[in-house]
């Protein structure tokens, strides 16, 4: 009998986890890919550095989040408005939310009304907000040096800085 309750509890937990999908634009914004970023994740007092690469893959975008040694932490494909696991890494809802929030931050001002139609967002010089539900919102702050500060949760923020790849050359 307790096995049934455990199965019901796990099913309910799965439904709750799947119910909140990150807000995504329809269709994807016009961005020049690939993009590479240095990411600093601030979770309370802890700060973690990582690298994020966004690249075109067929008709979708591959998001690869790597630790400083280049080990993948999350890999997701965004295609047809849906996230899909890419490779052997399991789906990571926190990574998906970060990727979706960064996509909102990177969307050009001129495309916001079209791509986020029907969503509760506002934009002002140096700042942008997207309300997710009655109790949460993504806050975006733009620094003059090109850095982006994303606040995606009560104690979870990201500092995102574009990496300059103009001097890189192919082997």
Regions found by a protein language model. Give the residues of each.
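Hydrophobic beta-strand positions
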Residues: 65, 76-77, 129-131
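C-terminal motif of bacterial Sec signal peptides marking the signal peptidase cleavage site
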Residues: 14-17
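Mature, soluble, non-transmembrane domains
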Residues: 19-21, 37-40, 45, 50-53, ...
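N-terminal, post-signal-peptide region of Sec/Tat-exported proteins
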Residues: 52-74
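Short, low-complexity, disordered segments immediately C-terminal to signal peptides
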Residues: 23-33
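Bacterial N-terminal signal peptides that target proteins for export
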Residues: 1-8
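Short acidic-glycine loop/turn motifs at beta-strand connectors
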Residues: 57, 78-82
